[in-house]
Amino acid sequence: MKTGYFLLEDGNKIEFELYPEAAPGTVANFEKLANEGFYDGLTFHRVIPGFVSQGGCPHGTGTGGPGYTIKCETEGNPHTHEAGALSMAHAGKDTGGSQFFIVHEPQPHLNGVHTVFGKVTSGLEFAKNMSNGDVMKEVRVEG
């Protein structure tokens, strides 16, 4: 099983598991970016209480990415946008890259539109209580 964590600058830790069987390309991309240090020092630039905490933009504005895009993996993916889901942000089908979000409360309207590739297993309260601009000190994937 692939697991990992977001270590926030304030010392709080959000732990997660990933779903490589449901979203192999998305998980491989996220793991590569995390373990290369791409996310280290980036912010959660879009935090909407009761909805999502979104991060992974190198510009901190929601307009950037890694310089490439990945395909959506929604077809046949059994995972839904329940509380704690990790999902890829995008500007339209197959335009995701590095931006992702953590779901605060169930968001069924996102099912089949965004790729769920994991779930928070510990520390969801830290995602729900963060503010725009909170920094990811370190993000890693293990296993």
From Swiss-Prot:
PPIase cyclophilin-type domain mapped to chain residues: 1-143
Q: Which family does it belong to?
A: Belongs to the cyclophilin-type PPIase family.
Which reactions fall under this protein's catalytic activity? [protein]-peptidylproline (omega=180) = [protein]-peptidylproline (omega=0)
The organism named in the record is Bacillus subtilis (strain 168)
Tell me, in a sentence or two, what this protein's role is. Answer: PPIases accelerate the folding of proteins. It catalyzes the cis-trans isomerization of proline imidic peptide bonds in oligopeptides.
Q: What is its EC number?
A: 5.2.1.8
Choose any GO biological process term that the UniProt entry carries and state it: protein folding
Q: Among the entry's GO cellular component annotations, what is one?
A: cytoplasm
Description of activity control = Inhibited by cyclosporin A (CsA).
Report the InterPro entries cross-referenced here.
Answer: Cyclophilin-like_dom_sf, Cyclophilin-type_PPIase, Cyclophilin-type_PPIase_CS, Cyclophilin-type_PPIase_dom, Cyclophilin_A-like
Name where it's found. Answer: Cytoplasm
Top-rank EC class of the record's enzyme: isomerase
**What GO MF terms are annotated?**
peptidyl-prolyl cis-trans isomerase activity
The answer to whether the entry has keyword Hydrolase is: no
UniProt keyword Nucleotidyltransferase, yes or no: no
Q: What is this protein called?
A: Peptidyl-prolyl cis-trans isomerase B
